[in-house]
Every structure is written in structure tokens, then in C-alpha cells.
């Protein structure tokens, strides 16, 4: 009696399924406690940071309907100023930011996910920040649930995330930390 060896694809299929499940595991988050994504390190804003040292320019924000995009950008600019984030023209900024927003309906409202890719001027991505907020409401159109108050809250959370990251960059090191080098 001879033993038949199964084809190689029999072993490859479960391995591929396992790898796909592992790579998607970071995409599943609970709506009751929204945790940061796998690629997003948790940063705590340094209170002693020199925020003027880490300049940024927002290059683009994609995903929101056009009528909300302008409002969101204004809210984000205001929230960034309140957090002393130094905004500069793209040609002179130390960090270039690309944002992505996505809203999807969930039970009792909408979930708005946001992703910020942080690049150096030579277009090398140095960080991806991900976060999400829940918006209360009803209906099938998740973006229709995002009112002015929700939009301002999302912009404030985005500014908090960006400020926390930027405050931990070398350019934002407090002056006292740099005095030893002089």
C-alpha cells in the first residue's frame, strides 16, 4: 500500500489563509472601545516640546464628501492652532501630512476612521497615525450623521494625535535637552 503525498497547494492554502487573517487582524476593532491600529504607535504629547520646531504641511485630506471637506479643513486648522502645531508651506515644512477619512454605519450611529500618513520632505513615510470616533445618529448614510459638533470633535482628535506625534520628533526637542550640545 503506497502513501500518496498531497499536492503542495494543499499546504499553501491554509498557510495563505492564516497570513491573510493575521494581516487583517489589525483592521478589526470594537465599537465600544476603539483602539489605535497596529501601525499606529501611541504617542503622548510632550508638554516641554518646542512645537515651533516641528513644522508640518497638510498636503491632502481624502475620503469625506466635498461639502464636508472644506468644513473639516477649517476645523482642523483651528484645532491645530489651539495645540500650537506649527503649520508651514509644503516647500519649507519638515513633515508633509496626507489624511484619509472614512465613515461607515454602525449600530446607533457612524464610525469615522482617520489615517494620517506623515512624510519627510523627500516623501519617505515616517509614521502612520490611525484613530477613530463614534458619532451618534441613525440612517444608512454615515456621512449624513456627521454634524458640525461631530466634525469639530473629529478635527480636535486628529489635531491631538498629530500634536502628540510631532511633539516627540527630534525637531520638537525642548531647548533644555539641546543645551548640552552647545
Name every feature range the model reports, one short phrase each.
Residues 2-16:
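Bacterial N-terminal signal peptides that target proteins for export
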Residues 22-26:
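C-terminal motif of bacterial Sec signal peptides marking the signal peptidase cleavage site
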Residues 28-44, 135-182:
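C-terminal/domain-edge helix-coil "capping" segments
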Residues 45-83:
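Post-signal-peptide N-terminal segment of Sec-exported extracytoplasmic proteins
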Residues 52-54, 81-83, 93-97, 110-114, ...:
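Envelope-exposed proteins and targeting segments
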Residues 65-73, 105-109, 144-155:
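Solvent-exposed, acidic/flexible segments
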Residues 87-105:
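A short, hydrophobic beta-strand-centered structural micro-motif
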Residues 105-138:
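Amphipathic beta-strand/beta-sheet edge segments enriched in Tyr/Trp
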Amino acid at each position: 500500500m503506497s502513501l500518496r503525498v498531497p499536492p503542495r497547494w494543499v499546504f499553501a492554502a491554509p498557510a495563505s489563509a492564516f497570513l491573510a487573517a493575521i494581516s487583517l487582524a489589525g483592521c478589526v476593532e470594537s465599537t465600544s472601545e476603539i483602539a489605535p491600529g497596529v501601525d499606529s504607535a501611541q504617542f503622548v504629547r510632550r508638554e516641554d516640546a518646542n512645537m515651533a520646531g516641528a513644522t508640518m504641511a497638510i498636503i491632502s485630506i481624502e475620503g469625506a464628501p466635498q461639502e464636508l471637506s472644506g468644513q473639516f479643513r477649517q476645523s482642523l486648522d483651528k484645532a491645530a492652532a489651539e495645540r500650537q502645531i506649527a503649520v508651514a508651506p509644503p516647500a519649507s515644512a519638515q513633515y508633509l501630512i496626507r489624511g484619509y477619512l472614512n465613515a461607515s454605519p454602525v449600530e446607533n450611529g457612524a464610525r469615522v476612521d482617520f489615517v494620517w500618513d506623515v512624510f519627510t520632505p523627500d516623501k519617505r513615510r515616517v509614521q502612520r497615525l490611525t484613530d477613530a470616533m463614534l458619532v451618534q445618529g441613525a440612517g444608512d448614510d454615515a456621512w449624513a450623521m456627521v454634524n458640525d459638533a461631530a466634525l469639530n470633535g473629529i478635527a480636535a482628535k486628529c489635531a491631538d494625535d498629530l500634536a502628540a506625534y510631532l511633539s516627540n520628533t527630534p525637531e520638537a526637542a525642548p531647548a533644555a535637552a539641546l543645551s548640552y550640545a552647545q
